[in-house]
Amino acid sequence: MAPINANDINDAKAFVPAKKALPEVDTEGSNGNGITSKGYSYETLLEIANFLLSRVADKPHIGIICGSGMGSYWKEGSLAETITDAFKISYEDIPNFPVSTVEGHHGQLVFGKICGIPVVAMQGRFHYFEGYPLWKCCLPVRVMKLIGIKTLIVTNAAGGLNPNYKVGDVMIVKDHINMMGFSGNNPLHGPNDERFGPRFPPMSKAYNLEYRKIAKAIAKELNIEDIVREGVYTCLGGPNFETVAELNMLKMVGVDSVGMSTVHEVITARHCDLKVFALSLITNECVTSYDMIGEANHEEVLDVGRMRQDVLRKFVSKLVERITQIDANDP
C-alpha cells in the first residue's frame, strides 16, 4: 500500500498544518526516534502508520481495543477470532511501539475483516500502572487514526459498582468520570498538535449516541437484553483494586463500573475526531461493605472474559456491520 502523508490521509480536514511550530521533541535517551518521556512527534507516528500499512492489503475502517480476556485467547469463540483473513504483528516488531505486560493481553495488532469490513484490533492494551505515561498508553489510538479508522470500539473488564449489575453483564458506556484527570493526569497534557485535534476538545458527547442505540437494538435481536446495561464508567490508576471507602465514594458520584483503562483512550480518540463506542464486561462485584465475602482478583476477570467470549463475538460482529452501514450513509 502506498505511504500516507498529512495531506492525503483519511479526512484532510482533520490534518490541517499546525498554526505554529511545536516545541522540538527531546531525543535525549531516545536514539533519535522522536519518542521520549516527554512525548511523541507527529512524524514518528506517521512512520509507524506507514510501516503497518506497507504490510496489509486494506486500510481498516474500524479499530477495536480488546479488554482483559476478551481478545487474548486465539481460539474458537474469542472476540479476536471473529477477524478473518487475519494478519498478526507483535508489538515487539513494530518500531517505537509499547509492549503489553499484563496477563490476558496478548500483545499484537490483528488486521483483517469482520463481516467483510476491514478492521484492526489491539490484542493487549497499555496501562498507566505498567509504568507508561498516559500519552504512551494512547499512542496506538493515534496510530490507528493515521492508518485510516473512522470509528473506535473499546472494550474493558470492569468491576460492577451498580448494585443491579451482576457478574457477566455487559454495560454500554454512556459517559465517564475522568478521576485521573482530576489530579492533572491527562493524555492530552503537553503541547497540542492541531493535525490531530484542537487544544480544548469537548467531551460532553464522547460516546456516540447512535451507536449506543444500535447496540441496544442488537442486544434485543440476540435476546441478551437481560444482561445488557448502560451506565457511567471510571478509570483508576491501579494496579491495586479499590478500597471499600474509595468504591463508596465513586458510587456516591454516579459511577456504575470501574476499571483501569478506556477513559484516556476515549479522550485521545475524540481529540482525533474518531467516533467512539465502548462497553464494559462486568467481571466482578465491587466490595462496597467490610462485611462482604471475597475480594477482586485478576484470575476472576479472565475467567468471566472467557465465559462471555461467544456473546461478545456475536455482539461486536453485528455492531461492526451496523456501524459501517450507517456511516456509509453519512454525507
Regions found by a protein language model. Name each.
Residues 2-203:
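Metabolite-binding pocket within alpha/beta catalytic cores that recognizes anionic/polar moieties
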Residues 144-148, 251, 270:
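Non-catalytic positions within long, well-ordered alpha-helices that form the structural scaffold/packing
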Residues 287-331:
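His/Asp/Glu-rich mid-to-C-terminal helical/loop segments that flank catalytic regions of hydrolases
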Residues 202-249:
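Active-site rim beta-loop-alpha module in soluble metabolic enzymes
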Residues 260-300:
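Zn-dependent metallopeptidase/amidohydrolase metal-coordination segment
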Residues 150-151, 256, 275:
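Short acidic/polar active-site loop segments enriched in Thr and Asp
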Residues 51, 55, 210, 214-225, ...:
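Generic non-transmembrane alpha-helical segments
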